[in-house]
Curated annotation (Swiss-Prot):
Residues 1-33 are annotated as: Disordered. One of its GO terms (cellular component) is nucleus. It comes from the Eukaryota. The record marks D425 as: Important for substrate specificity. Its main location: cytoplasm. This is Tyrosine 3-monooxygenase. The gene is Th. Fe cation binds at H331, H336, E376. It comes from Mus musculus (Mouse). Inhibited in feedback fashion by the catecholamine neurotransmitters, especially by dopamine in competition with tetrahydrobiopterin. Phosphorylation of several Ser/Thr residues in the N-terminus regulates the catalytic activity. Ser-31 and Ser-40 are readily phosphorylated to activate the catalytic activity. A Cysteine modification induced by N-ethylmaleimide (NEM), inhibits tyrosine 3-monooxygenase activity through the modification of the Cys-177.
Amino acid sequence: MPTPSASSPQPKGFRRAVSEQDTKQAEAVTSPRFIGRRQSLIEDARKEREAAAAAAAAAVASAEPGNPLEAVVFEERDGNAVLNLLFSLRGTKPSSLSRALKVFETFEAKIHHLETRPAQRPLAGSPHLEYFVRFEVPSGDLAALLSSVRRVSDDVRSAREDKVPWFPRKVSELDKCHHLVTKFDPDLDLDHPGFSDQAYRQRRKLIAEIAFQYKQGEPIPHVEYTKEEIATWKEVYATLKGLYATHACREHLEAFQLLERYCGYREDSIPQLEDVSHFLKERTGFQLRPVAGLLSARDFLASLAFRVFQCTQYIRHASSPMHSPEPDCCHELLGHVPMLADRTFAQFSQDIGLASLGASDEEIEKLSTVYWFTVEFGLCKQNGELKAYGAGLLSSYGELLHSLSEEPEVRAFDPDTAAVQPYQDQTYQPVYFVSESFSDAKDKLRNYASRIQRPFSVKFDPYTLAIDVLDSPHTIRRSLEGVQDELHTLTQALSAIS
């Protein structure tokens, strides 16, 4: 089986075949699992991208042959059509431009912007220029205007305006990031373990209401968990904790001990998000925010940019304690929270979020896939051994065993490769990516993110909890002033100890 380093064979005790494991472990790896698909950010991001592409294709397909509006992209605004138009002039005489502009005057079009550009497709005998005009005209006159422009100009075509998708600029705007993916809701999915359990469904609605009513900055309301919910937690907690010493990474183990000491992590009590959020805030600046289910990929990643982790409060159904088709508090509290208490990993998580702000649907899908193979199912090397750091592994007994057995393929982490790697959401992953260290993974991610096409860069301001959009010399200079202040403080500190 390929591994990142052939010169460093893995200890037999950590990468064993399923057949070599004890009976309980073997059953956990091979036992039937919940047959519904696990929810994932990748699936949601893919659907968003495909929906946008389908809408664009439908618009083109619906255009009638010979229609002047065929393949023309415009925006409806108060009965007017607003669009960008590109065209080339016929001939080189100045009167050619006059004739073209006369058309806009005749139809009383309001011109917002006019400029010349180097022609992308220069015509023989014509100047190597084309004209870009953004204008507004009554919608009923648009077809006639375009027909007239085509009679006096060449290569007439509309240009879609590149719009940057909305993203929150202030932490308070996370209240708008609430788009849930409900495919695996117990009220809707026949295969969900809780579908036929009316009491469970009502309980989920009650807990979900906390998230729906929550506003950023408020204390997170406590949940009084039932005896059955605590019993489910106890089974998951005790089973997974028995594996952590040999399978979890060093950072997870250290944070888990602190959580047991300060946040009430124990078998007979489910920790409250408010207490855990205070703990994380003091450690790495991350905060928790209650959420009713799986958020859309764009909304979830945007939250990470503010060091806010959207966290569920409900618990999986008692009939399926070792597996859940959706994120629940076992997954969040046992898998994600300990890792978010590590400074380097917290920065890695925030970097993924920052890279997502204003990114295209295609890039969101790729970032979601990188997130899947790192934050959810990532492995790392420590002291020559493979260890798990992904929350999907650290909250699933069977997959944790599987990931460190000899069954799956293990590859060195490379964001470009991971971003397009097919993923598995019906059974265990056949492929995992291993990082040399969290610092190495962070550097590789930043290099990958620097190549995402956006007309700006972004920076998180920890004082105002806001996103600084760096899109002008002024905003960059202002950001540099803050860096200079920090460097001055560090220089003084070095002088004091030297």
